[in-house]
């Protein structure tokens, strides 16, 4: 099932949480992992930890909200590696902190979309030429079950009624679907992953799943063989419904 010829994977937001664990597991599998992070000190510390574990890791300065930063990261990967085999768009933020839609300001939505959607789009577009050079490029967009209209129709705690975050993840899923249609006929596969409510800084460590559990579906989608799906939305149990709740 795992592809043997993949060599280089770039993970955004890789200095902590799900991104760091995903990088670690791909590194254990033998990939060179490029740790995209906007904070240099944290990025280098993450690199140091993985290097001590025997993983071929490298910090790459990458702020997904800054086009110049993305361009420099693309140029670095192009110069030093020539192609990219796996792109994992993991960087994300949540600003609600329990606030309901009417309690948000427009700036909250703009800030959320800047990282979760616009940044993800720019990173994907920027690295696409290098992914095309791969023998089988894989893109995994770390979404959320909250990006499913179906899941949002279920009775949930009001703290999960997060307009900015949920909307941004729904937009990510549409990006996944539309890019998959554009990339039909190529060797690239792109999918969205729902890692579940995980114990990370994103939710002030209030989740109930470990980063190891969360990384499972991301790793699976990142290492799909040529018969794997593209344009889908998956969690550890399989397909996540886009909109219709049964």
Locate the predicted segments by residue.
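Conserved glycine-rich Rossmann-like NAD(P)H-binding loop of the short-chain dehydrogenase/reductase
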Residues: 29-45
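Hydrophobic positions on the long internal alpha-helix
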Residues: 88, 123-127, 131, 175-176, ...
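C-terminal helical subdomain
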Residues: 170, 185, 192-193, 200, ...
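Canonical Rossmann dinucleotide-binding motif of NAD(H)/NADP(H)-dependent dehydrogenases/reductases
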Residues: 2-34
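The beta1-alpha1 cofactor-binding region of Rossmann-like NAD(H)/NADP(H)-dependent oxidoreductases
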Residues: 40, 60-73
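A glycine-rich helix->loop->beta "capping" turn
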Residues: 53-56, 76-89, 95-97, 105
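Catalytic loop of short-chain dehydrogenase/reductase
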Residues: 93, 97-113, 132-184
């Amino acid at each position: 099932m795992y592809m043997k010829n993949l060599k280089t994977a770039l993970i955004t937001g890789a200095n902590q949480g799900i991104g760091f664990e995903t990088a670690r597991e791909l590194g254990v599998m033998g990939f060179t992992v490029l740790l995209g992070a906007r904070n240099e000190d944290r990025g280098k510390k993450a690199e140091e930890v993985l290097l001590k574990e025997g993983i071929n890791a490298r910090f790459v300065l990458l702020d997904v909200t800054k086009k110049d930063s993305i361009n420099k990261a693309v140029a670095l990967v192009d110069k030093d590696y020539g192609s990219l085999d796996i792109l994992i768009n993991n960087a994300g933020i949540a600003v609600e902190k329990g606030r309901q839609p009417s309690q948000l300001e427009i700036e909250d939505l703009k800030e959320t979309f800047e990282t979760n959607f616009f940044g993800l789009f720019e990173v994907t577009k920027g690295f696409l030429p290098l992914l095309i050079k791969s023998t089988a490029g894989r893109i995994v967009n770390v979404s959320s079950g909250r990006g499913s209209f179906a899941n949002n129709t279920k009775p949930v705690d009001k703290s999960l009624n997060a307009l900015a975050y949920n909307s941004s993840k729904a937009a990510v899923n549409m990006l996944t679907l539309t890019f998959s249609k554009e990339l039909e006929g190529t060797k690239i596969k792109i999918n969205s992953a729902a890692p579940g409510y995980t114990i990370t800084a994103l939710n002030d460590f209030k989740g109930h799943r470990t980063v190891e559990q969360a990384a499972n579906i991301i790793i699976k989608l990142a290492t799909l063989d040529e018969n794997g799906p593209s344009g889908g939305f998956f969690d550890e149990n399989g397909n996540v419904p886009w909109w219709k709740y049964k």
